[in-house]
Amino acid sequence: MVPEMSERQVFQASELTYLLENCSSSYDYAENESDSCCASPPCPQDISLNFDRAFLPALYGLLFLLGLLGNGAVAAVLCSQRAARTSTDTFLLHLAVADMLLVLTLPLWRVDTAVQWVFGSGLCKVAGALFNINFYAGALLLACISFDRYLSIVHATQPYRRGPPARVTLTCVVVWGLCLFFAIPDFIFLSANRDERLNAMHCRYNFPQVGRTALRGLQLVAGFLLPLLVMAYCYARILAVLLVSRGQRRQRRMRLVVVVVVAFALCWTPYHLVVLVDTLMDLGALDRNCGRESRVDVAKSVTSGLGYMHCCLNPLLYAFVGVKFRERMWMLLLRLGCPDHRGHQRHPTLSRRESSWSETPSTPR
């Protein structure tokens, strides 16, 4: 998965020459990799391209700023509290890094969408792989956080505290390794190519339809369904425990639990549904026509933008909602020399093993 405009198939000059010389019938854009001439000419992309150029550059610029600032703040707070960092905090730190690295690629895709790809094939492969690595890492780290909370609340166990401190780091290394493996197709098949219809260079995949379908299947399973199922199961069990709890603290924590799954599902479900429709059209299971293709292209742009917004929501959901994170943020600002406008002689102090996840305030000593 790379930003949607760059995922469209390249229409090479050699393909155009072959079609003009060998096809008496018209050409089916959905099957441009096949050796046969097909039933319909390539559809005009004016509507979707104009929409992309008006909508995506502004969105990518906004997400770049918000994602960098929000996740940078999370990373700064968690790094400043290394001695008090819990396993959940370590996962949150890796999640913030993944989201920051993802949004750092958005300026490149902004140029690709607004003008053309001017950075060469090497940077095309690196940017696409970096984008995908952090796309998968964000989803899988959310699943790790869910499982960690599940063990802590439902089974009252802290698996990462009983073993060596490196155990949680090893889990994160495994996650990053899997994501790097999933990004291998980007290093192989992404390149800067000239689209003769658009008369512009773009960073796009070059592989047959079966490869495109397989890659989309991997994205759907590893980047969405599997993490969502893990989160749904873990948080369903957590909710069952919290609902029978009479403590006000646990009832407050339940709100955050619900928001976590709902936000992930709302941000990414529309995109994967649209991609599923597009894939079914590619496979011939749904009829393809120019009007439907144009609507699907626009829908992919809108829903992919909604998905990328999840990178900006993570700091809000996992940190800024938490009272303890705000306390840690305030303590960091005080150490950096910011004036204290709260009028308190004493500032809240956190337990050395309290997670930034918590919604409940700590008690001043």
From Swiss-Prot:
Sulfation on Tyr-27 and Tyr-29 is essential for CXCL10 binding. N-glycosylated. SUPFAM superfamilies: Family A G protein-coupled receptor-like. Pfam families: 7tm_1 (PF00001). It comes from the Eukaryota. The chain crosses the membrane at residues 58-78, 89-109, 127-147, 170-190, 224-244, 257-277, 302-322. Residues 1-57, 110-126, 191-223, 278-301 are extracellular. One of its GO terms (biological process) is angiogenesis. It is found in: Cell membrane. One of its GO terms (molecular function) is C-X-C chemokine receptor activity. Keywords: Angiogenesis, Cell membrane, Chemotaxis, Disulfide bond, G-protein coupled receptor, Glycoprotein, Membrane, Receptor, Sulfation, Transducer, Transmembrane, Transmembrane helix. The keyword Disulfide bond applies. Residues 342-365 are annotated as: Disordered. GO terms for cellular component: external side of plasma membrane; plasma membrane. Glycans are attached at N22, N32. It is a multi-pass membrane protein. Its main location: membrane. The modification Sulfotyrosine is found at Y27, Y29. InterPro entries: CCR1-9-like, Chemokine_CXCR3, Chemokine_rcpt, GPCR_Rhodpsn, GPCR_Rhodpsn_7TM. Disulfide bonds join C124-C203. Belongs to the G-protein coupled receptor 1 family. Receptor for the C-X-C chemokine CXCL9, CXCL10 and CXCL11 and mediates the proliferation, survival and angiogenic activity of mesangial cells through a heterotrimeric G-protein signaling pathway. Probably promotes cell chemotaxis response. Binds to CCL21. Upon activation by PF4, induces activated T-lymphocytes migration mediated via downstream Ras/extracellular signal-regulated kinase (ERK) signaling. Homomer. Forms heteromers with ACKR4. Interacts with PF4/CXCL4. This is C-X-C chemokine receptor type 3. It comes from Canis lupus familiaris (Dog).
